[in-house]
């Protein structure tokens, strides 16, 4: 077991430099760790599983996977389940949290493995390696990148210089080698098709000084062909999609669909891969590593050569020999290779045969090749070019990362593609699985055997457990005597080298000698090997040809004759025509590199990461139990746990055991402090004894304490948690009282702050309004009310209400514009032959412009449209008078329409909004006159006149504004009034006959007013107002029976009280029926078509005061029709004590604009009562409506308005066919017929057409909202 880091240690490097650390004092336990540490799902270390079965392992991994915990330990082995998504667990904060921490202190993570490897290197002065294994798509490459990320972050202490350069180059190898060595397969979008062993070299200070990469098993056959729905190496798609115009011109590049090698499989794009951006990342990695521009051009020239070689197509001639269908393609390929085109065609079509007699050189013949042979030679050349190019890139990277100073230690990271089982398994799968068998052998020897050796070393009594040793499978593949599979392949290749089919048959015959091996089965033209991961059936066809791995001498002569020096660098070996030595086969190379890898790994201290793929669909939520059980079996996880649990499930050094559990013994702890004075071993024994653990459940080793069953450890952890709860209960009694008092005080403070915070924003805006006016303008009394708030969007444009949506669409306001202010206004409109007149408008201000929207009746239909749009940048100044009127002029740049003059009751708020949006870069002119542009070249002046006879809003006539006196210009707003105290509700009595009204309170007349004021409209969510129906006459006897209390035995029932006298007859009431739906604003009454309301007052300006459900409000008179009342019936019997309320009808649920609870928020045309009922402006009720505002009546005529027809919905535009991609100009080279990818076009999503602006059907909109409200109520 690795030595644990000491608590309080600041860094691994410091500990390494200081030599052996002294025994450290046990730190005081921290009670808060149980509250701050996240509770893990399942068990984080599977050695603590109660049941050791594959199913139990799978259940634990599944629970943790579903809880987004993908890492689990088996002792020091990390199990990683690929999450197929970003869990946010690789950030710098997470990385730093593992820095300098022991494995047991933190939850399982790949950073913990990296920290352990780096720490052991610096403290034990030994080389380390991290072996990552698992099947394709299980996350090995990602784990390797995270290991390098951690080591690069924690190693070294100096910034800049060579150390940082080495770190950058090490990290830059990831995108570079992924581009050239990874490809999309059926199981993985970024599958490593080669093995990579990265060795990071460190100096004595623990700082990286260099690195070296060793490449294994590049799958070069993928260059010339792939199965369906797979791709070639990423670099080909990056190159063809992301190359610059200069590259395309130099190399004759087209899209990936133009090349047979990379388009034949029908997969050109991958959703999870952006080839263009990845190509830019590859170029940056080349620059970081130090590749010159000439070297980069040479690399891309070889890639282009491979692509054009694949487009050389062979056809069968009349004589049965192969011929090139388009010599122009061969000419361009020869141009890229810098060889003679005729020589290239000859090498591809002819083969040189040489006869020998008795060791003497004989005759030389040129033998024509058929189509299959020519294609094989072309593919062999392409594969050799790519393989040697990849080897050159690796060697070039090693040159750049070569250490400049001596290195002392190494941390190796092995990332090699995992065990593979396909439907058709060939030589590539045999090689891959062989290497994985070797890695499994290392795991068995170094992990399972080391586990048993630890028990022996610690002198622990235990029973050994047998485990599967896969060395017999490795011998089956690699042994020479008796001949293994590789040796048999070599013999078959040597005896029938001229005919691949004959060589395959020879191998089948020779492999029959392997049938005696229990792990081998011959099955005709196939054979089966029983690997540790499962049985794999291999196909013999083509296996001997792949094992040859040599180019014919004709192709080597062709390359030797090239004028490209880079090509000579890729093929440094000269052709020896006299050599009779058999070149090494692919099997020989694989066996040699695998044994060298094993030798390197055996010289290091290993760390293991076993990766698991949860499903085959790369889904972040799917968990395939069957597939994972198979991986658990062949990874040997159960055997690993059994060996770890053979004697004892948990072990820890004495110091760590004491640090964790010393609280459980009164002899070792007092008040949380460690008080034991003896040695650590005796301290552990005392803790376990006082915890009442049986002696057979634990043993003491030489340096560690061992616990047999995981239940014992769980018990100790539970007792440790219970200790803190017991101690906490003693403190809680005294603490609760303090906390209660503190909480009550905090609640009071919070309540006060919340109340102030809500009004603070509006008070700041209001104060800014005072600054804008600067004491120059008389103020309206209602503008100075303390409850006056600058709400802004009074028409609810941004709130999504029906009216807001209608106005937004009519004004054509884009969704990107933010509405800051909206209100009703009256625009001064000049008409031919008549004086100017105020006309109602909707005023909207966004962050870009000011909008004036008008509603008009045209052909019996209400039409709302945009009248004028004024960009904020065109407003030069704002002009107002110095009296209390509401007139405002926007002085804009010269235009035909001139400057708009309008009135707005929220003028101060409107000006503050405009100044805020424009940054205050405009002047506000306040004076006795308003100077404005009536037209483009025509100026005009509006004068003011103070007239005390004008009681309501200002009047306008002949360029003169008449208005009464207002509050002094230097007036300030009143403070916010305190909230009313809550009224305690009286207890209900059984004899109460007063009906309960859950609606708004009844209106009460203000001082000086003759009529009660209408209550302000409720803001926030729309509510359904209950409707109270007239009580139905019920016989008195029935009433008494219904309300009689239950009888009490032995007591006579008291007679019921006499009914109250009937109320005196009042004046006759007039009821009217609503003809249309109407949604009103503040002080107005909502109407639903068909309902009846009582008319309380009729005004000449077209608005009537109506009563509905005990509430009053204004409604348009031409929306109502009188209901003829029947003759009054005879007086009914006494009414019951409680009226019966009928079910309320559906009310409109259209949300209204936020209401303001003071007079300044009420438009002038709503304040009728103040102008007609009292001579003082101070007594004007907030919801009254002046008689001088007849122009604000929405229906302009008294006649019954016709119901507009619903406008037709514009037809949905037809979805056109997807246009064919534009094909660039054909390069000046001919192209051979190519294999096009499979058609996989999908119709794109078509956005729904936007709503047509302009006229909207208000009646239909209100009816639709009323129906929706009815559905919600039902």
Curated annotation (Swiss-Prot):
**Where do the annotations place ATP binding?**
134-141
Q: What's one GO-annotated cellular component?
A: actin cytoskeleton
State the residue spans of region: Actin-binding.
410-492
Domain IQ span(s) in chain numbering: 725-745, 746-771
Give the GO molecular function terms. actin filament binding; Arp2/3 complex binding; ATP binding; hydrolase activity; microfilament motor activity
First-listed, main subcellular location of the protein, grouped into a coarse class: cytoplasm
* Superkingdom field: Eukaryota
Pfam short name (any one): Myosin_TH1
Where does this protein have compositionally biased stretches of type Low complexity? 1042-1053, 1139-1157, 1170-1226
What keywords tag this UniProt record?
Actin-binding, ATP-binding, Cytoplasm, Cytoskeleton, Hydrolase, Motor protein, Myosin, Nucleotide-binding, Phosphoprotein, Repeat, SH3 domain
Query: InterPro entries per the record?
Result: Kinesin_motor_dom_sf, Myosin_head_motor_dom-like, Myosin_TH1, MYSc_Myo1, P-loop_NTPase, SH3-like_dom_sf, SH3_domain
Phosphoserine-modified residues are 363
Ranges for domain SH3 come to: 1067-1125
- Keyword Glycoprotein set for record: no
Question: Compositionally biased, Pro residues: which spans?
Answer: 1054-1067, 1126-1138
**Entry text on domains:** The myosin motor domain displays actin-stimulated ATPase activity and generates a mechanochemical force.
General function of this protein: Type-I myosin implicated in the organization of the actin cytoskeleton. Required for proper actin cytoskeleton polarization. At the cell cortex, assembles in patch-like structures together with proteins from the actin-polymerizing machinery and promotes actin assembly. Functions as actin nucleation-promoting factor (NPF) for the Arp2/3 complex.
Q: What is this protein called?
A: Myosin-1
Tell me what gene encodes this.
Answer: MYO1
């Amino acid at each position: 077991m690795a030595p644990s880091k000491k608590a309080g240690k600041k860094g691994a490097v410091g500990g390494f430099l200081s030599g052996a650390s002294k025994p450290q004092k046990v730190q005081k336990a921290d009670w808060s760790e149980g509250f701050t540490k996240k509770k893990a799902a399942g068990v984080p270390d599977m050695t603590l599983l109660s049941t050791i079965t594959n199913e139990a392992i799978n259940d634990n991994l599944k629970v943790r996977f579903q809880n987004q915990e993908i890492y689990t330990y088996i002792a020091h082995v990390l199990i990683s389940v690929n999450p197929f998504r970003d869990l946010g667990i690789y950030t710098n904060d997470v990385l730093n949290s593992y820095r300098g921490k022991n494995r047991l202190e933190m939850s399982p993570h790949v950073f913990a493995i990296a920290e352990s490897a780096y720490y052991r290197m610096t403290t034990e002065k030994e080389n380390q390696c991290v072996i990552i294994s698992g099947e394709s798509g299980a996350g090995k490459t990602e784990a390797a990148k995270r290991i390098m990320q951690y080591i690069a972050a924690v190693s070294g202490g100096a910034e800049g210089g060579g150390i940082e350069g080495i770190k950058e180059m090490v990290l830059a190898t990831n995108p570079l080698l992924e581009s050239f060595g990874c490809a999309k397969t059926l199981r993985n979008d970024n599958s490593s098709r080669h093995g990579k062993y990265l060795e990071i070299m460190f100096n004595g200070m623990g700082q990286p000084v260099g690195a070296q990469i060793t490449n294994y098993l590049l799958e070069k056959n993928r260059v010339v062909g792939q199965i369906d729905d797979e791709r070639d190496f990423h670099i080909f798609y990056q190159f063809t999609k992301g190359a610059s115009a200069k590259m395309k011109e130099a190399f004759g590049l087209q899209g990936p669909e133009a090349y047979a090698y990379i388009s034949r499989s029908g997969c050109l794009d991958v959703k999870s891969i952006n080839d263009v951006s990845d190509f830019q990342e590859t170029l940056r990695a080349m620059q970081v590593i130090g590749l010159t521009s000439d070297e980069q051009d040479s690399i891309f020239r070889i890639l282009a050569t491979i692509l054009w070689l694949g487009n050389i197509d062979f056809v069968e001639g009349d004589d049965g020999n192969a011929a090139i269908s388009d010599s122009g393609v061969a000419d361009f390929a020869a141009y890229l290779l810098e060889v003679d085109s005729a020589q290239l065609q000859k090498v591809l079509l002819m083969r040189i045969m040489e006869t020998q007699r008795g060791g003497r050189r004989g005759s030389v013949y040129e033998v024509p090749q058929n189509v299959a042979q020519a294609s094989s030679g072309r593919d062999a050349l392409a594969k050799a070019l790519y393989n040697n190019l990849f080897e050159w890139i690796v060697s070039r990277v090693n040159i750049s990362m070569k250490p400049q100073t001596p290195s002392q230690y190494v941390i190796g990271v092995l990332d090699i593609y995992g065990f593979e089982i396909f439907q058709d398994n060939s030589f590539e799968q045999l090689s891959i699985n062989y290497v994985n068998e070797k890695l499994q052998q290392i795991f068995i020897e170094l992990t399972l055997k080391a586990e048993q050796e630890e028990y022996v070393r610690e002198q622990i009594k235990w029973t050994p457990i047998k485990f599967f040793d896969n060395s017999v499978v490795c011998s089956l593949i690699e042994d020479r005597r008796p001949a293994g599979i590789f040796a048999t392949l070599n013999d078959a290749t040597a005896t029938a080298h001229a005919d691949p089919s004959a060589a395959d048959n020879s191998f089948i015959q020779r492999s029959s000698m392997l049938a005696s091996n229990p792990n081998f089965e011959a099955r005709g033209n196939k054979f089966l090997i029983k690997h540790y991961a499962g049985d794999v059936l291999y196909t013999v066809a083509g296996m001997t040809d792949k094992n040859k791995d040599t180019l014919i001498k004709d192709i080597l002569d062709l390359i030797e004759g090239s004028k490209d020096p880079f090509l000579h660098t890729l093929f440094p070996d000269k052709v020896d025509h006299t050599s009779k030595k058999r070149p090494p086969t692919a099997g020989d190379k694989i066996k040699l590199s695998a044994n060298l890898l094993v030798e390197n790994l055996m010289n290091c201290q290993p760390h293991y990461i076993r990766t698991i793929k949860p499903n085959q669909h790369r889904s972040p939520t799917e968990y395939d139990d069957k597939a994972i059980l198979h991986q658990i079996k062949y990874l040997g996880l159960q055997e690993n746990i059994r060996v770890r649990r053979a004697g004892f499930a948990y072990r820890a050094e004495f110091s760590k055991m004491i640090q964790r559990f010393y609280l459980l013994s009164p002899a070792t702890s007092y008040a949380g402090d460690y008080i034991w004075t003896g040695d650590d071993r005796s301290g552990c024994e005392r803790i376990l004894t006082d915890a009442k653990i049986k002696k057979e459940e634990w043993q003491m080793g030489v340096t560690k304490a061992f616990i047999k069953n995981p239940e014992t450890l769980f018990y100790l952890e539970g007792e440790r948690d219970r200790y803190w709860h017991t101690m906490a209960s003693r403190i809680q009694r005294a603490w609760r009282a303090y906390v209660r008092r503190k909480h009550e005080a905090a609640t009071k403070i919070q309540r006060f702050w919340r109340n102030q915070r809500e009004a603070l924003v509006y008070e700041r805006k209001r104060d800014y309004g005072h600054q804008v006016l600067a004491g120059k303008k008389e103020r309206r009394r209602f503008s100075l009310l303390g409850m006056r708030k600058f709400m802004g969007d009074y028409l609810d444009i941004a709130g999504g209400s029906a009216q807001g949506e209608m106005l937004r669409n009519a004004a054509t306001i884009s969704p990107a514009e933010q509405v800051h202010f909206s209100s009703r206004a009256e625009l001064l409109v000049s008409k031919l032959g008549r004086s100017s007149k105020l006309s109602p408008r909707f005023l909207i201000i966004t962050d870009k412009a000011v909008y004036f929207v008008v509603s008009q009746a045209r052909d019996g239909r209400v039409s709302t449209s945009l009248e004028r749009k004024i960009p904020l940048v065109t407003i030069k100044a704002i002009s107002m008078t110095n009296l209390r009127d509401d007139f405002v002029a926007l002085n804009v740049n010269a235009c035909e329409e001139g400057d708009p003059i309008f009135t707005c009751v929220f003028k101060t708020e409107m000006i503050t909004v405009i100044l805020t949006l424009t940054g205050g870069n405009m002047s506000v002119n306040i004076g006795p006159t308003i100077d404005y542009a009536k037209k483009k070249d025509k100026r005009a002046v509006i004068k003011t006149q103070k007239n005390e006879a004008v009681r309501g809003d200002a009047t306008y006539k002949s360029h003169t504004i008449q208005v009464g006196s207002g509050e002094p210009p230097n007036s300030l707003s009143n403070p916010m009034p305190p909230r009313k105290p809550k009224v305690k509700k009286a207890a209900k009595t059984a004899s109460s006959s007063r009906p309960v009204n859950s609606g708004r309170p009844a209106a009460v007349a203000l001082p000086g007013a003759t009529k009660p004021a209408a209550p302000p409209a409720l803001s926030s969510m729309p509510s359904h107002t209950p409707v109270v129906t007239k009580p139905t006459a019920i016989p008195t006897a029935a009433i008494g029976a219904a309300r009689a209390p239950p009888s009490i035995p032995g007591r006579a029932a008291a007679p019921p009280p006499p009914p109250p006298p009937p109320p005196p007859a009042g004046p006759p009431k007039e009821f009217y029926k609503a003809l249309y739906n109407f949604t009103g604003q503040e002080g107005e009454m909502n109407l639903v078509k068909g309902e009846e309301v009582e008319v309380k007052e009729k005004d000449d300006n077209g608005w009537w005061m109506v009563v509905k459900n005990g509430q009053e409000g204004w409604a348009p008179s031409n929306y109502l029709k009188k209901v003829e009342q029947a003759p009054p019936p005879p007086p009914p019997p006494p009414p019951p004590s409680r009226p019966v309320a009928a079910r309320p009808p559906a009310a409109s649920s259209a949300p209204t604009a936020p209401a303001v609870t003071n007079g300044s928020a009420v438009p002038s045309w709503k304040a009728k009562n103040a102008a007609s009922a009292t001579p003082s402006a101070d007594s004007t009720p907030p919801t009254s409506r002046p008689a001088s505002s007849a122009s604000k009546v929405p229906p302009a005529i008294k006649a019954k308005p016709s119901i507009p027809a619903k406008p037709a919905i514009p037809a949905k535009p037809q979805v056109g066919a997807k246009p064919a991609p534009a094909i660039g100009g054909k390069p000046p080279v001919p192209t051979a017929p190519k294999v096009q990818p499979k058609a996989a076009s999908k119709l794109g999503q078509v956005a729904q057409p936007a709503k047509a602006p302009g006229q909207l059907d208000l009646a239909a909109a209100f009816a639709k909202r009323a129906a929706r409200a009815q559905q919600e109520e039902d």
